Amino acid sequence: MIDCAIIGGGPAGLSAGLYATRGGVKNAVLFEKGMPGGQITGSSEIENYPGVKEVVSGLDFMQPWQEQCFRFGLKHEMTAVQRVSKKDSHFVILAEDGKTFEAKSVIIATGGSPKRTGIKGESEYWGKGVSTCATCDGFFYKNKEVAVLGGGDTAVEEAIYLANICKKVYLIHRRDGFRCAPITLEHAKNNDKIEFLTPYVVEEIKGDASGVSSLSIKNTATNEKRELVVPGFFIFVGYDVNNAVLKQEDNSMLCKCDEYGSIVVDFSMKTNVQGLFAAGDIRIFAPKQVVCAASDGATAALSVISYLEHH
């Protein structure tokens, strides 16, 4: 039987694996179908992780994490997990190929995925001017003009954040009304650096080998078209947590989740199910930063070690 099964191979999962193996967990297994690393491997530039002296790609940044974990004995099961369920005092992990595994404890570190828009050019320039993280990438556009797409709290809050860094921020929304908190909207409207473009849609993201250069936008009320010359385009149209592994045969969830599907945990990353932990972007109130996900993974692993000692 597996002592600790870690579902997901991003920064949270790998950190959990490192701390678990170095902490004496003899049989820790990482379940990740492809090479571990997580969605951060798709980033073209990492600059805000402590100790990283030069800008590196997400792929290069995560490679040593994998090597370090495997060096300390973390095992890698290259399969996707379909479902995690509990049977008596242990967990049953069902893989997509029908194979099952049993584990004494489980850390869910499956993360989440920003919703895509399908705008022409989005995939081509993803990570090359198209971003879903102002905290991660805003600094690259210091004193430059950028555009933000979205009408919820996150979009408006990130527009305000970017206004502290950038020369100008265009906030694009397909409707005249916003779904964010009124006080947040008021702060954005009172910021001279933020220009509201409503009701507008983005028809195309344009650029060249160096990245994004402009956006083609259209007013849905008048059909007026404009070209915004911006090197950075931030998309905030929603976020999907990858919690499908929690869904049971009767459609219930293995553990408590909030209204967005994020796993409810305490400060030690414990869920309401004994022996089940969660870390990284899958949990409630996740900051969605690599350094925070790594911290979560370490915390979850330490909690697992304590759990295994007493059970």
Swiss-Prot record:
Keywords: Cytoplasm, Disulfide bond, FAD, Flavoprotein, NADP, Oxidoreductase, Redox-active center
Localization per record: Cytoplasm
Catalytic activity from the UniProt record: [thioredoxin]-dithiol + NADP(+) = [thioredoxin]-disulfide + NADPH + H(+)
GO BP: cell redox homeostasis; removal of superoxide radicals
Gene Ontology MF, one: thioredoxin-disulfide reductase (NADPH) activity
Free-text cofactor note: Binds 1 FAD per subunit.
Pfam families: Pyr_redox_2
Disulfide bonds: 133-136
UniProt EC number: 1.8.1.9
Cofactors named for this entry: FAD
Binding site for FAD: 31-39, 281-290
Top-level class of the enzyme under EC nomenclature: oxidoreductase
Family, per entry: Belongs to the class-II pyridine nucleotide-disulfide oxidoreductase family.
NCBIfam families assigned: TRX_reduct (TIGR01292)
Subunit-level organization: Homodimer.
Protein name, as recorded: Thioredoxin reductase
